[in-house]
Amino acid sequence: MKASDVRALTADQLKDELAKLKKEQFNLRFQKATGQLEKSSRINEVRKDIARVKTIARQKAAEVKA
């Protein structure tokens, strides 16, 4: 997911996206532990997507306060 795509989302959509990504991250960790994970690089992608969503949500919250 690109940062420009994330910036287009509203605050509620960001929360939903974050919840979805965290759920996916949990499932990927579970797959890794059981040896069923096919694309191990997806774990890093999801982790970075979570960071992007959190960063942009924080920036939007700061804009509202300013």
Swiss-Prot record:
Gene Ontology cellular component terms for the protein in this record: cytosolic large ribosomal subunit
PROSITE patterns xrefs: RIBOSOMAL_L29
Domain of life, per lineage: Bacteria
One GO term of the biological process aspect: translation
UniProt-recorded Gene Ontology molecular function terms: structural constituent of ribosome
A Pfam family that the UniProt record links to this protein: Ribosomal_L29
Key words, A-Z: Ribonucleoprotein, Ribosomal protein
Transmembrane portions of the chain: none
Family matches, as SUPFAM superfamilies: Ribosomal protein L29 (L29p) (SSF46561)
Keyword Ribosomal protein: yes
Ribonucleoprotein found in the keyword field: yes
Membership in a protein family: Belongs to the universal ribosomal protein uL29 family.
Name of the protein in question: Large ribosomal subunit protein uL29
The organism's taxonomic lineage, starting at the top: Bacteria, Pseudomonadati, Pseudomonadota, Alphaproteobacteria, Hyphomicrobiales
